[in-house]
From Swiss-Prot:
PANTHER family: ARGININE-TRNA-PROTEIN TRANSFERASE 1, ARGINYL-TRNA--PROTEIN TRANSFERASE 1. InterPro entries: Acyl_CoA_acyltransferase, Asp_Glu_LeuTrfase, N-end_Aminoacyl_Trfase, N-end_Aminoacyl_Trfase_C, N-end_Aminoacyl_Trfase_N. It is found in: Cytoplasm. Belongs to the R-transferase family. Bpt subfamily. GO terms for molecular function: arginyl-tRNA--protein transferase activity; leucyl-tRNA--protein transferase activity. The lineage of its organism: Bacteria, Pseudomonadati, Pseudomonadota, Gammaproteobacteria, Moraxellales. The gene is bpt. Pfam families: ATE_C (PF04377), ATE_N (PF04376). This is Aspartate/glutamate leucyltransferase. Keywords: Acyltransferase, Cytoplasm, Transferase.
């Protein structure tokens, strides 16, 4: 494991870089991660600065992809005051107005949270690297945090049906992970959970919901491009995507999306 120093104002922190390993998003690709020394307990301001240069939190780890000759993991965020729902999002919003939202710190997690998480992984992600679920995995991934984190809960009467883990930042929220009742498929709870997080950011008068990484050629990550406008971290600058890309446009990006702005995007959809 090598020590690493990113080129940012955060050089007083210690970072490490992992050896190459199989990419979680793209077949036949290898990946490397830069991560903050987990001994650091970071505050909201530090996490916010890290997020603005492309880092993300998972459990006690704050990381950023640093892959050789591949730049397909693009940090993305939604400017909440400019966001407009599309037709499918409006339907999900209307369909779930019977749900009640509550906010609790992640350290207040109970067996109710874990049981919902366990069902979700077993029924929705049995083919993924998080299967089989365990209480230890749940606590390390979603309960433990090196910063200020909370659960945004959605309740149907007295039944918990959806939980989003969120990190508070000085300019918004970071959406860490969402899990929900697999029997409630018709509600589009994954969509509605993002819409509620966008609403919550507006209610506390902040600006952005960070959605992690948009990976254009990964089907499971491409849903993030439906939240428009979407800002992408390209070549060290946040650039705005003003409409959703079609599958044809995404396929035209080729095998290796770079951090510099594709020239055909400049006049067409980014300002």
């Amino acid at each position: 494991m090598k020590s690493y120093q990113p080129k940012s104002l955060l050089n007083d922190l210690q970072y490490y870089i992992t050896p190459p390993h199989d990419c979680s998003y793209l077949d036949n690709k290898s990946a490397r991660m830069v991560f903050l020394d987990p001994i650091h307990r970071i505050d909201v301001v530090t996490l916010s600065e890290l997020s603005r240069v492309g880092f993300r939190r998972s459990g006690d780890f704050v990381y950023r992809p640093e892959c050789h000759l591949c730049r397909q993991c693009l940090s993305c965020r939604v400017p909440v005051h400019d966001f407009n729902m599309n037709s499918l999002q409006k339907k999900a919003w209307k369909r779930n107005q019977d749900l009640r939202m509550s906010i609790v710190p992640t350290h207040a997690a109970t067996s109710v949270h874990y049981q919902l998480y366990e069902r979700y992984i077993n029924e929705r992600h049995a083919d993924g690297d998080m299967f089989p679920p365990s209480l230890d995995q749940f606590e390390k991934f979603l309960v433990h945090s090196c910063t200020e984190s909370f659960f945004l809960e959605l309740w149907k009467d007295d039944r918990l049906i959806c939980v989003s883990t969120c990190d508070l930042m000085d300019d918004g929220l970071s959406a860490v992970y969402t899990f929900f009742d697999p029997d409630e498929n018709r509600r589009s709870l994954g969509v509605f959970a993002i819409l509620k997080q966008l609403e919550y950011v507006k209610s506390i008068d902040l600006d952005y919901l960070y959605l992690g990484y948009w990976v254009p050629h990964s089907q499971k990550m491409n849903y993030k491009s439906q939240y428009i406008p979407l800002e992408l971290l390209l070549d060290g600058q946040w650039r705005r995507l003003n409409r959703a890309l079609s599958q044809e446009e995404i396929s035209q990006l080729g095998e290796s999306l770079m951090t510099i702005l594709p020239s055909e995007w400049n006049s067409m959809i980014i300002k």
